Amino acid sequence: MIKSFFAALSFISRLPVPARLSQGLEIEQYQRSIVTFPLVGLLLGAIAGAVALLLQPWCGVPLAALFGVLALALLTGGFHLDGLADTCDGIFSARTRDRMLEIMRDSRLGTHGGLALIFVLVAKVLVIGELLLRDTHPIAALAAACAVGRGMAVLLMYRHRYAREKGLGNLFIGKVSLQQTLVTMAMGVALATVLLGLQGLRAALITLVLIWGLGWALKRTLGGQTGDTLGAAIELGELLFLLALL
């Protein structure tokens, strides 16, 4: 379990992980690490929340929220944001399925991807700022949001097919079991409830339903999921959870 956690941490974040703790795992062990995704999110969100908390007395709520979002982007290396941009470039191109997947594979940023990044990042700053004004603890809010966002992404893996022939997403999509799916989601919901009480539970359940709907819509449009759509689900899951806290 410990090796799985550090494997997941090295896979979906830029935090340094000693090689002895994350290397030498079989493919099946990487797939089993999905259940630790909410714990990785918990850690990343707690660090970003701590940044916002420490800066708030010095620079005020708006800038504290901005630097909290920036910290989260740096901690993940923009990994999930890149997936969000690629997904929106493809989906909103209104082309054929194959052409959408080609566009998503293109490393260049398009108009729709740029707009999606602006919207999501600005929305996160505004929502976190509003939560700070309402005296919601930033560490609890961001830790819970990141845990739930990564926990609910499993909904785009279980009983879905990979839309391409190869890629990083193929490691998880269609490869997770029902038990892994339930444990991963339950962990995200439980962490949100522990950190934020009934408000966190409500926000987590709302996020669950909306991310399930997102997965269904993407499946109909693309014929399956990709690593990019998983990244999009994580980013949107975080934002939806934070919005549901308001």
UniProtKB/Swiss-Prot annotation:
Belongs to the CobS family. Keywords: Cell inner membrane, Cell membrane, Cobalamin biosynthesis, Magnesium, Membrane, Transferase, Transmembrane, Transmembrane helix. PANTHER family: ADENOSYLCOBINAMIDE-GDP RIBAZOLETRANSFERASE. The chain crosses the membrane at residues 34-54, 59-79, 113-133, 138-158, 171-191, 194-214. It is found in: Cell inner membrane. HAMAP family: CobS (MF_00719). It catalyses: alpha-ribazole + adenosylcob(III)inamide-GDP = adenosylcob(III)alamin + GMP + H(+); alpha-ribazole 5'-phosphate + adenosylcob(III)inamide-GDP = adenosylcob(III)alamin 5'-phosphate + GMP + H(+). The keyword Coiled coil does not apply. InterPro entries: CobS (IPR003805). It comes from the Bacteria. Its cofactor is Mg(2+). This is Adenosylcobinamide-GDP ribazoletransferase. It comes from Klebsiella pneumoniae (strain 342).
